[in-house]
Amino acid sequence: MNLQNKILKGTTTVGIKVKDGVVLAADRRASAGYYVAHKYVRKVLYVTDNIGITTAGSVADLQFIYEALKYIYHRNSITGEGPITVKGIATWLANVLSSSKYFPYLVQILIGGVDDQPRLYNLDYLGDITEEEYTATGSGSPEALGVLEDNYKPEMSLDEAAELAKRAIFSSIKRDSFTGTGVIVTKITKNGHEEKEYYITKR
């Protein structure tokens, strides 16, 4: 199995950027091969109130990167350099991933947030970075992208984007055996984030 397949297997995450903010969403299943390792894993995390990430890939690598992102953000605030921007966070991480490409972190990460405007970035394990209007990662991304491409509109509201992200993940749950249990959807604005959880059946 190649590196890209290892990273893609086991999850679906979605990011959508609209004029009022950014929506991030992810399913909750963790799989090890064809085994469901955990049903309620958190794949939407927050660097600060108005910057979030979604995660796919090696749990150990993701934990290290998440703690590093929080450290960089808070270090800048403490040292008086001022809050780092969403673009700054994404660029810093892209440099870290690129410099480690011979011994790569096995991750695929979406970074979304709002400072002067909404921003959404997609980063792969080699440090390639793209700014997106909408995107999906993981083994269920083909199904999710189909829903996004058919329904995304730049002028849609944040609530409409959140509903679309939920639909995209649930579409993947129906078709992808590595995606499952439920969905976490968060709406991010410059004032913070609001998160909701949805499940196939009651917990």
UniProtKB/Swiss-Prot annotation:
<dbReference type="GO" id="GO:0019774">
    <property type="term" value="C:proteasome core complex, beta-subunit complex"/>
</dbReference>
<keyword id="KW-0865">Zymogen</keyword>
<comment type="function">
    <text>Component of the proteasome core, a large protease complex with broad specificity involved in protein degradation.</text>
</comment>
<dbReference type="InterPro" id="IPR019983">
    <property type="entry name" value="Pept_T1A_Psome_bsu_arc"/>
</dbReference>
<dbReference type="InterPro" id="IPR000243">
    <property type="entry name" value="Pept_T1A_subB"/>
</dbReference>
<dbReference type="GO" id="GO:0004298">
    <property type="term" value="F:threonine-type endopeptidase activity"/>
</dbReference>
<comment type="subunit">
    <text>The 20S proteasome core is composed of 14 alpha and 14 beta subunits that assemble into four stacked heptameric rings, resulting in a barrel-shaped structure. The two inner rings, each composed of seven catalytic beta subunits, are sandwiched by two outer rings, each composed of seven alpha subunits. The catalytic chamber with the active sites is on the inside of the barrel. Has a gated structure, the ends of the cylinder being occluded by the N-termini of the alpha-subunits. Is capped at one or both ends by the proteasome regulatory ATPase, PAN.</text>
</comment>
<feature type="active site" description="Nucleophile">
    <location>
        <position position="11"/>
    </location>
</feature>
<keyword id="KW-0378">Hydrolase</keyword>
<protein>
    <recommendedName>
        <fullName>Proteasome subunit beta 2</fullName>
        <ecNumber>3.4.25.1</ecNumber>
    </recommendedName>
</protein>
<feature type="propeptide" description="Removed in mature form; by autocatalysis">
    <location>
        <begin position="1"/>
        <end position="10"/>
    </location>
</feature>
<keyword id="KW-0645">Protease</keyword>
<comment type="similarity">
    <text>Belongs to the peptidase T1B family.</text>
</comment>
<dbReference type="InterPro" id="IPR023333">
    <property type="entry name" value="Proteasome_suB-type"/>
</dbReference>
<dbReference type="InterPro" id="IPR001353">
    <property type="entry name" value="Proteasome_sua/b"/>
</dbReference>
<dbReference type="Pfam" id="PF00227">
    <property type="entry name" value="Proteasome"/>
</dbReference>
<keyword id="KW-0068">Autocatalytic cleavage</keyword>
<dbReference type="InterPro" id="IPR016050">
    <property type="entry name" value="Proteasome_bsu_CS"/>
</dbReference>
<keyword id="KW-0647">Proteasome</keyword>
<dbReference type="GO" id="GO:0005737">
    <property type="term" value="C:cytoplasm"/>
</dbReference>
<dbReference type="InterPro" id="IPR029055">
    <property type="entry name" value="Ntn_hydrolases_N"/>
</dbReference>
<keyword id="KW-0888">Threonine protease</keyword>
<dbReference type="GO" id="GO:0010498">
    <property type="term" value="P:proteasomal protein catabolic process"/>
</dbReference>
<keyword id="KW-0963">Cytoplasm</keyword>
